[in-house]
Amino acid sequence: EPDYVKALAELCAEKDWLLLADEVQTGVGRTGSLFAFQQYGILPDAVSFAKGIAGGLPMSGILANEKCRNVLGPGTHATTFGANPVCAAAGLVVQETLSDAFLEEIKAKGAYLREGIESLALPCFDRTRGLGLMIGIEVKDGFTNKDIANRLIENGLLVLTAGPGMRLLPPLVITKEEMDQGLEIMRKVLA
């Protein structure tokens, strides 16, 4: 929720606490911007990112400002996602792909998918939320997200459960036809 994120950033600034953004899932275009924090108008002291930076190959990174750049000295941090030449090459391709137009497409695809889900008016879904192609679906009381997810998966639509709700994390290159196919599976299985 935008108000929560902004209030947290203000509290960290007021108390002189470090604000760290974990963008492992949300970063590198998933939400329609390079990093999700950019859509909230805040600037964290450090940002961690992985997964999308090399198209799913093992690579990660941390960006930090002056305030916390000396917190981790040489040899105090190791990673299994430190990359290699193949992952670095994939990372370069990802960086070349992340144009403003590509990020705008992700925002538009996310809006299309959320509007499509809401227009189905399914009895088990309350509302959708999210940024870009990171979509959450709130499940109404009386329905079980695991049962809904299993039914969708059995019919060819991969969804994730998250708490009492569900998450959709389609590939950033998903087409309108593929989104329509997923919406049709939802309609057929859950209406």
Feature map (PLM): residue ranges:
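Conserved N-terminal phosphate-binding loop of PLP-dependent enzymes in the Aspartate aminotransferase
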Residues: E1-A191
